[in-house]
Curated annotation (Swiss-Prot):
Domain of life: Eukaryota
TM spans (from-to): 321-341
Associated pathology: Immunodeficiency 51: A primary immunodeficiency disorder with altered immune responses and impaired clearance of fungal infections, selective against Candida. It is characterized by persistent and/or recurrent infections of the skin, nails and mucous membranes caused by organisms of the genus Candida, mainly Candida albicans.
Role according to the record: Receptor for IL17A and IL17F, major effector cytokines of innate and adaptive immune system involved in antimicrobial host defense and maintenance of tissue integrity. Receptor for IL17A. Receptor for IL17F. Binds to IL17A with higher affinity than to IL17F. Binds IL17A and IL17F homodimers as part of a heterodimeric complex with IL17RC. Also binds heterodimers formed by IL17A and IL17F as part of a heterodimeric complex with IL17RC.
Domain SEFIR: start-end pairs: 377-534
Assembly notes: Forms heterodimers with IL17RC; the heterodimer binds IL17A and IL17F homodimers as well as the heterodimer formed by IL17A and IL17F. Forms complexes with 2:1 binding stoichiometry: two receptor chains for one interleukin molecule. IL17A homodimer preferentially drives the formation of IL17RA-IL17RC heterodimeric receptor complex, whereas IL17F homodimer forms predominantly complexes with IL17RC homodimer. (Microbial infection) Interacts with SARS coronavirus-2/SARS-CoV-2 virus protein ORF8.
Segments in the Cytoplasmic topological domain: 342-866
Keyword Protein transport: no
Coiled-coil features, chain-numbered ranges: none
GO biological process: cell surface receptor signaling pathway; defense response to fungus; fibroblast activation; granulocyte chemotaxis; inflammatory response; innate immune response; interleukin-17-mediated signaling pathway; interleukin-17A-mediated signaling pathway
Tissue: Widely expressed.
Listed name of the protein: Interleukin-17 receptor A
Length: 866
């Protein structure tokens, strides 16, 4: 690569102008890291097969660490070289060169990773050398070079070379880093590069300034080969002074291509001031590569020098001239003394009051001209870090104060979560920034503890930060996304005016402001909020001869508004929380090591426990059990007052095994006027003895009335209210047994007496066999219909117990008959006898419903009574 040629002294010709125009069009619009494509990327050497690949700066050896890793590079050197692209453009590149250490670690060297970090934008680009063969000792040092990283003028980079595989987290580092500063476009070699040429490094405007008559200046300069507008800045100064006495600005539209490299003449009119004679003229271009930050060229016009040729004084002066000069001097002195005496008398006389009033009126006239500038509706975008729920509340109250007290529209992520969810985080952030730039609005950056930590993590100098509030929000951490979006603006000083850097002095400090905003002014809130408001309005607080003030926003006057008082209350709450919990930020960081034991304000202040301590939500499943031989059921039929279908409620109570006891069955029969029967079947308490169960008798089934081994039966007796109603076709409950005829009641009492005597005789003999009386139920179909009705309702009555099938009942009865017949029966208590009597009465009432079976029942009942 040859040395750079010096630029020609003469003005470039038309052919060179067209070439420079083409280079300006092809030049990139913004500075960014990239690789040069002038030749293929080659890293192979004799004895080594190697390829160069683009890398993501994250090698897989960090995920899968190796036991044996190579040592670090040696003699890392970085130099500035220049290279041409395929289109012939000249770009500055970073020439990186390093060597390997002569130890056995080269046997485990699999490659190298080159990383270039641009410090002002935090942009990184990586390239990986992948060795396809193992390195061997060849009696000299292995040396590698790479010259494809394109750098920009006046930028600083950090170059790092990693040997692969990378070491384990606790191992010694095997990389080497160096900083590299690229010179600006004033450098002789950098001046002829494509990036510098596109920003006008070779442009020589050759400014000439001529002073014309009638207080005018003629400015002439040479245009550059880019169609862009120019601006002429004229500043005039008094002789031998530095403060300006006149300023003027003149815009020149973009020239046509045929006017490139031609002279442009502009005539400027000066103010008629005799002492304002020294002028400074500046030409500011607006090239596409640098916009309003391009280099300015200036020229100065000095004050004209007066000739020092004094007039010759005559040697002889007449005497009368002396007397004339003396007289004039006396008159002047006398006039001055007289004027002083008159002024003193007038001020002390009666007319002084009037003069004073006139003076006040005269002094008050200029005050009428001091009209405050009109305020415009503005919009701001607030960028902040959600450090804590209380700090988020402070930001919300600050936004509310801007809306209500200042009339300023606010763009805040907390107020536009739906729009962020629909458009996406980066799309919404880019849209807000574009809107702020187009409307010439301001972006307020609220700095806090989290902004400093996130900025350090963004630079790679601190631990990663993940706050609870960011984790809880649907959109996540918007501060990091916003910082990535606004970072390129801080390469251009002209963009600094868009950003207003603030921090709440009550809960934050000046050290929480990231280094990125070091060149921007910092405003502690709410002490200097008045200045922030003037920044939002694009007004200067201090101007020549006047000072703008907003009394409602100065000092502590913001507390007069409701929004200001709410903001102060939010600041006090957060400050008190910081005093109570000094390590609050570490507790809010989810990446902190002791996060498990840290208390959270979400649980203490904003949330209440849903369940008492030590309890939880328990899911219980019902356990369905079939009534067995040890089960007991008691039936209590009740009569409803309203019409409707019959509803049966069955609740089985299982008797614990090993505690059998005889339990009499009881049945309650109640009558209703009109309506359906509502029957509730509930288990009765058991004492000890054999259990009983519920079964429905079929036609021809023998049902024993006494004896503990037998199965007990509950029967529901339906008695018709009207004796004329047919018992077979009526489903209405029957009346009380007191309504029966006298002979029927006497027959029933005799039957019960005979049964009682039989039971007593069985006790006297030490045991009794099964009763001989068998009741035949001719109304089995009707009972079967009742049973089917009860079973059909079980699907709708959740608490009904399933009924055992008839076959199972008969099998159980046969098994009970096979038991020991010689087992003596236990004595009956008076309560058992009363229950038995009630049962027999129910059976009799059922038989009375059936006219056809009365004679048979009577003959069979007389037998056992005898």
């Amino acid at each position: 690569m040859g040395a750079a040629r010096s630029p020609p002294s003469a003005v470039p010709g038309p052919l060179l102008g067209l070439l420079l125009l083409l280079l300006g069009v092809l030049a990139p619009g913004g500075a960014s890291l990239r690789l040069l494509d002038h030749r293929a990327l080659v890293c192979s050497q004799p004895g080594l097969n190697c390829t160069v690949k683009n890398s993501t700066c994250l090698d897989d050896s960090w995920i899968h660490p190796r036991n044996l890793t190579p040592s670090s590079p040696k003699d890392l050197q970085i130099q500035l070289h220049f290279a041409h692209t395929q289109q012939g453009d000249l770009f500055p590149v970073a020439h990186i060169e390093w060597t390997l250490q002569t130890d056995a670690s080269i046997l485990y060297l699999e490659g190298a990773e080159l990383s270039v970090l641009q410090l002002n934008t935090n942009e990184r680009l990586c390239v990986r050398f992948e060795f396809l063969s193992k390195l061997r000792h060849h009696h000299r040092r292995w040396r590698f070079t790479f010259s494809h990283f394109v750098v920009d003028p006046d930028q600083e980079y950090e170059v790092t070379v990693h040997h692969l595989p990378k070491p384990i987290p606790d191992g010694d580092p095997n990389h080497q880093s160096k900083n590299f500063l690229v010179p600006d476009c004033e450098h002789a070699r950098m001046k002829v590069t494509t990036p510098c040429m596109s920003s006008g490094s070779l442009w020589d405007p050759n400014i000439t300034v001529e002073t014309l008559e009638a207080h005018q200046l003629r400015v002439s300069f040479t245009l550059w080969n880019e169609s862009t507008h120019y601006q002429i800045l004229l500043t005039s100064f008094p002789h031998m002074e530095n403060h300006s006495c006149f300023e003027h600005m003149h815009h020149i539209p973009a020239p046509r291509p045929e006017e490139f490299h031609q002279r442009s003449n502009v005539t400027l009119t000066l103010r008629n001031l005799k002492g304002c004679c020294r002028h400074q003229v500046q030409i500011q271009p607006f090239f596409s590569s640098c916009l309003n930050d391009c280099l300015r060229h200036s020229a100065t016009v000095s004050c004209p020098e007066m000739p020092d040729t004094p007039e010759p004084i005559p040697d002889y002066m007449p005497l009368w001239v002396y007397w004339f000069i003396t007289g004039i001097s006396i008159l002047l002195v006398g006039s001055v003394i007289l004027l002083i005496v008159c002024m003193t008398w007038r001020l002390a006389g009666p007319g002084s009051e009037k003069y004073s009033d006139d003076t006040k009126y005269t002094d008050g006239l200029p005050a009428a001209d001091l009209i405050p500038p009109p305020l415009k509706p503005r919009k701001v975008w607030i960028i902040y870090s959600a450090d804590h729920p209380l700090y988020v509340d402070v930001v919300l109250k600050f936004a509310q104060f801007l809306l209500t007290a200042c009339g300023t529209e606010v763009a805040l992520d907390l107020l536009e979560e739906q729009a962020i969810s629909e458009a996406g985080v980066m799309t919404w952030v880019g849209r807000q920034k574009q809107e702020m730039v187009e409307s010439n609005s301001k972006i307020i950056v609220l700095c806090s503890r989290g902004t400093r930590a996130k900025w350090q993590a963004l630079l790679g100098r601190g631990a990663p930060v993940r706050l609870r509030c960011d984790h809880g929000k649907p959109v996540g951490d918007l501060f990091t996304a916003a910082m990535n979006m606004i970072l390129p603006d801080f390469k251009r000083p002209a963009c600094f005016g868009t950003y207003v850097v603030c921090y709440f002095s009550e809960v934050s400090c000046d050290g929480d402001v990231p280094d990125l905003f070091g060149a921007a002014p910092r405003y502690p809130l709410m002490d200097r909020f008045e200045e922030v408001y003037f920044r939002i309005q694009d007004l200067e607080m201090f101007q020549p001869g006047r000072m703008h003030r907003v009394g409602e926003l100065s000092g502590d006057n913001y507390l007069r508004s409701p929004g200001g008082r709410q903001l102060r209350a939010a600041l006090d709450r957060f400050r008190d929380w910081q005093v109570r919990c000094p390590d609050w930020f570490e507790c809010e960081n989810l990446y902190s090591a002791d996060d498990q034991d840290a208390p959270s304000l979400d649980e203490e202040v904003f949330e209440e426990p849903l369940l008492p301590p030590g309890t939880g939500i328990v899911k219980r499943a019902p356990l369905v059990r079939e009534p067995g031989s040890q089960a007991c059921l008691a039936i209590d039929p009740l009569v409803g007052e309203e019409g409707g279908a019959a509803v049966a409620k069955l609740e089985p109570h299982l008797q614990p095994r090993g505690q059998p006891a005889p339990q009499p069955l009881h049945t309650l029969v109640l009558a209703a006027e009109e309506g359906a029967l509502v029957a509730a079947v509930e288990p009765g308490p058991l004492a000890d003895g054999a259990a009983v169960r519920l079964a429905l008798a079929g036609e021809g089934e023998a049902c024993p009335l006494l004896g503990s081994p037998g199965a007990g039966r509950n029967s529901v007796l339906f008695l018709p209210v009207d004796p004329e109603d047919s018992p077979l076709g009526s489903s209405t409950p029957m009346a009380s047994p007191d309504l029966l005829p006298e002979d029927v009641r006497e027959h029933l009492e005799g039957l019960m007496l005979s049964l009682f005597e039989q039971s007593l005789s069985c006790q006297a003999q030490g045991g009794c066999s099964r009763p001989a009386m068998v009741l035949t139920d001719p109304h089995t179909p009707y009972e079967e219909e009742q049973r089917q009705s009860v079973q059909s309702d079980q699907g709708y009555i959740s608490r009904s117990s399933p009924q055992p099938p008839e076959g199972l009942t008969e099998m159980e009865e046969e098994e009970e008959e096979e038991q020991d017949p010689g087992k003596p029966a236990l004595p009956l208590s008076p309560e058992d006898l009363e229950s038995l009597r009630s049962l027999q009465r129910q059976l009799l009432f059922r038989q009375l419903q059936k006219n056809s079976g009365w004679d048979t029942m009577g003959s069979e009942s007389e037998g056992p009574s005898a």
